[in-house]
Swiss-Prot record:
Source species: Streptococcus equi subsp. zooepidemicus (strain MGCS10565)
Residue ranges of the motif 'HIGH' region: 31-41
Cofactor note: Binds 1 zinc ion per subunit.
Top-rank EC class of the record's enzyme: ligase
Subunit structure and binding partners: Monomer.
Cofactor: Zn(2+)
GO CC list: cytosol
Protein family: Belongs to the class-I aminoacyl-tRNA synthetase family.
Chain sites annotated for binding Zn(2+): 29, 212, 237, 241
PANTHER family: CYSTEINE--TRNA LIGASE, CYTOPLASMIC, CYSTEINYL-TRNA SYNTHETASE
Subcellular location(s) per record: Cytoplasm
InterPro entries in the cross-refs: Cys-tRNA-ligase, Cys-tRNA-synt_Ia_DALR, Cys-tRNA/MSH_ligase, CysS_C, Rossmann-like_a/b/a_fold, tRNA-synt_1_cat_dom, tRNAsynth_Ia_anticodon-bd
Official protein name in the record: Cysteine--tRNA ligase
Amino acid sequence: MMIKIYDTMTRSLREFVPITDKVVNMYVCGPTVYNYIHIGNARSAVAFDTVRRYFEYAGYTVNYISNFTDVDDKIIKAAKEAGLSPKQLADQFIAAFMEDTKALGVKPATKNPRVMDYMDEIIAFIAALIKKGYAYESAGDVYFRVAKASNYARLANKTIADLEAGASGRTDTETALKENPLDFALWKSAKPGEVSWTSPWSAGRPGWHIECSVMATELLGDTIDIHGGGADLEFPHHTNEIAQSEAKTSKTFANYWMHNGFVNVDNEKMSKSLGNFVTVHDLLKTVDGQTLRFFLATQHYRKPINFTEKAIHDAEVNLKYLKNTLQQPTVATADSSQLAAFVTAFKAAMNDDFNTANGITVLFDMAKWINSGAYSEAVKSAFEEMLAVFGIVFEAESLDTEIEQLIAERQEARANRDFAKADAIRDQLAAQGIKLLDTKDGVRWIRD
């Protein structure tokens, strides 16, 4: 079975064909590190971590690059307010990002490049665009000539004519420096007192879009397999990445474009003005990281997902059920054909554009089968591997000696028809969170 990906560029489901056999080169836009990440950022991190994990489950080697934007107007403003340097502020929130995403079970990226570490490469990239006629200097700034780009904004299903109609009438200071209102900044001269780097055009800093183009091509080559990010990045960020990257290299920048949907809070768009802005840092004080991750997996990555207290509660209950399933004692054998059918169904769900919602349905069908007494070592291994695709890994919990002894004593009491003692032991175990299940095959237990 082939993995199929919904490609934003073509607006179609396409079979995934890597540039190099069994290798996936992925670049996913990471956060601008001026604050704690919000749940929308978390959805992107979790969605593409799941994509990465499924590729690895399917036998691929994944080079996963996700950047930190540590040079940005928002960082400069926040650093000034906090009395820190931009680097100090960025370091603080990069550390917070790593801590928060670790709690969500997000695997470390192959590399997390930082803009500050690629300044020489960014300047060289811009110089190459100027040399080819795709960019120009104006009063110390450098802008990209949108009119010269081939099929500009095709990713966002827009045309230059559409965009020009929307840009007509602009009269701000920056627009006055441009040949065309649609042209976007590759380099911006610094204001007095702002952090800056020396360049042939001015002491300044790069524009947002050029940063990702440079880091992606430096680390993964001129053409990458998959470029991902939130749906809000489709235009202008990813649109402009394509324009400048393909102008420089004359090659396709990315073969597949993937975008995750938004997170709403109680059916409303999350925003600071509505007072429903939820950071992961605060959320993790009351919600377990695995529960939050499992909630984010319950909806297909391209669709919007609604964050509510009930949805989090449901995720918590469902995770507990899966955990209890994993804690069943194993049996010698189970129906291998039924196991194969579950594995096939799971792959079919995930091969269909990483449909986690359908994949989770398979997991619960399999859990029901396991709880009927079909928990062999082979079944256990397959079930754990599927859970790991969703970043769900439970710590091994063994039945300790005391509980084992109590269960044995209860069995002996039942054999001697001392039902009062047997019931007392059951109550004692229940107080410790151990639930006993009397089945035709003997006693089975779960942590309740």
